[in-house]
Amino acid sequence: MTLHNNNTTSPLFPNISSSWIHGPSDTGLPPGTVTHFGSYNISRAAGNLSSPNGTTSDPLGGHTIWQVVFIAFLTGVLALVTIIGNILVIVAFKVNKQLKTVNNYFLLSLACADLIIGVISMNLFTTYIIMNRWALGNLACDLWLSIDYVASNASVMNLLVISFDRYFSITRPLTYRAKRTTKRAGVMIGLAWVISFILWAPAILFWQYFVGKRTVPPGECFIQFLSEPTITFGTAIAAFYMPVTIMTILYWRIYKETEKRTKELAGLQASGTEAEAENFVHPTGSSRSCSSYELQQQSMKRSARRKYGRCHFWFTTKSWKPSAEQMDQDHSSSDSWNNNDAAASLENSASSDEEDIGSETRAIYSIVLKLPGHSTILNSTKLPSSDNLQVPEEELGSVGLERKPSKLQTQQSMDDGGSFQKSFSKLPIQLESAVDTAKASDVNSSVGKTTATLPLSFKEATLAKRFALKTRSQITKRKRMSLIKEKKAAQTLSAILLAFIITWTPYNIMVLVNTFCDSCIPKTYWNLGYWLCYINSTVNPVCYALCNKTFRNTFKMLLLCQCDKRKRRKQQYQQRQSVIFHKRVPEQAL
């Protein structure tokens, strides 16, 4: 966590401890500076008065008993809140299945790092502050520093992973979310911890063996290779300022992309309102064309182009039997729709939620309904216009009629004159599915092929358009809900990032200042800045609760000991469902 050496544990109230030290004041000396007065060794870092054999003259480190009680109480409460808060996060993730999402796996890893800091780092550093010396030996010192730095660096790495995950989820929703699985999240979390361990643990534990001696004085505890301010400055840049810069840039990009999607959604809702007025079917048999509607984000950028989209609504395929062949026939048309023709297509987009399923599949079922109009022969200059739906004569049976699928492809392009071309298939009835990736062979048919017609009432056409408008609102609602989820995740990230910057920046600013001015930072500020970094582990669970309603409700349930009630309600519900099922089985058997 801390990027400077840990030997800045002078008394929290230096004016009190100065009464124990006789001679010139050591105020303003850089961390780790040692001054000698006669037979005494006064360490500016440890702030204790000791004889050459290492015995300490002041057991309270220069503090009064009330100061010790105040420091112990304040830091003890912070450590307890940190431990309880992060344990709540871990237990909530365990008991509530709604929290077992990919994004929350990263928060779980962050909570584990914060829990380690609350259990080990906070308490040992408090002891170090109160006693003004390290009394647990060299091995315990190195182990504490290793755990402290690995857990703190893992927190930074987890924040980086969360930032990149949010960024790719918003900017690359189709490609990234298909690969966004819990297994991949576990790999990323493991890499964050492994990298943190490799960077700090070996150097802290074995540096004294690399250089051949231990230069940390007895009674002090700090990282040996960070005793030089220049090295400390380099580690501060690499381990704090660079990650913070990257996370800030990513969050800014996330914010801009979210705002962009909000504007696009507002435009989509506005186009849906206009479509209700545009899609009025006249009793004479003619109708206006479907208003422009585009689901894909890329098409939204082409605001200068006129778009003739499709109206979408849900459709079931129980009564439809797809054929093995799909007949295509491309024909061009004039720059406008025929007044007697209108098309309504059905589309079912089944996409998995980004937090529940790692991949997305899309099933598209389409059917074109022709409104009553003049029956004409399809040619290269006019759109197909008919009073009835057209079905190949070969597909008509003697006993009953069975609708078969055909493929409809509409392609439109704009030239400089504002005209466009469309390609239509000969058959207006269409059923295509993209769930299975199998590709049916396309067989071209001639223009003069004989067709039969099925009557289509005005009521059916009106019903189709009504479903299309309803589904438009459903798709808009689904997009709005997805955007709300993205905003909530971005809010959680912003809260965590803001807390991280606020709590870590003061100490790292002092590190930079100390590199150029080793007498500008008072001793007390070092201790406060060091402890402020620890407080970040206390604040993180609060950020989860404030920004995530599910976390907040689960925390409340755990604190009020309502887990058993929740389990009992679930068991009672399952029992009721089982009773209902058993009651229905005999009825079905009869």
From Swiss-Prot:
Its main location: membrane. It is a multi-pass membrane protein. A motif (Basolateral sorting signal) lies at residues 275-281. One of its GO terms (molecular function) is G protein-coupled acetylcholine receptor activity. One of its GO terms (cellular component) is basolateral plasma membrane. Residues 334-345 have a biased composition (Low complexity). Residues 1-67, 126-142, 208-229, 514-527 are extracellular. GO terms for biological process: adenylate cyclase-activating adrenergic receptor signaling pathway; positive regulation of MAPK cascade; positive regulation of smooth muscle contraction; saliva secretion. Residues 92-104, 165-184, 253-492, 548-590 are cytoplasmic. Residues 407-419 have a biased composition (Polar residues). Gene3D superfamilies: Rhodopsin 7-helix transmembrane proteins. The modification Phosphoserine is found at S385. Disulfide bonds join C141-C221. It comes from the Eukaryota. SUPFAM superfamilies: Family A G protein-coupled receptor-like. Keywords: Cell membrane, Disulfide bond, Endoplasmic reticulum, G-protein coupled receptor, Glycoprotein, Membrane, Phosphoprotein, Postsynaptic cell membrane, Receptor, Synapse, Transducer, Transmembrane, Transmembrane helix. The chain crosses the membrane at residues 68-91, 105-125, 143-164, 185-207, 230-252, 493-513, 528-547. The muscarinic acetylcholine receptor mediates various cellular responses, including inhibition of adenylate cyclase, breakdown of phosphoinositides and modulation of potassium channels through the action of G proteins. Primary transducing effect is Pi turnover. Homodimer; the dimers can form tetramers. Interacts with NALCN. Interacts with TMEM147. PANTHER family: 5-HYDROXYTRYPTAMINE RECEPTOR, MUSCARINIC ACETYLCHOLINE RECEPTOR M3. Belongs to the G-protein coupled receptor 1 family. Muscarinic acetylcholine receptor subfamily. CHRM3 sub-subfamily. This is Muscarinic acetylcholine receptor M3. It comes from Bos taurus (Bovine). The lineage of its organism: Eukaryota, Metazoa, Chordata, Craniata, Vertebrata.
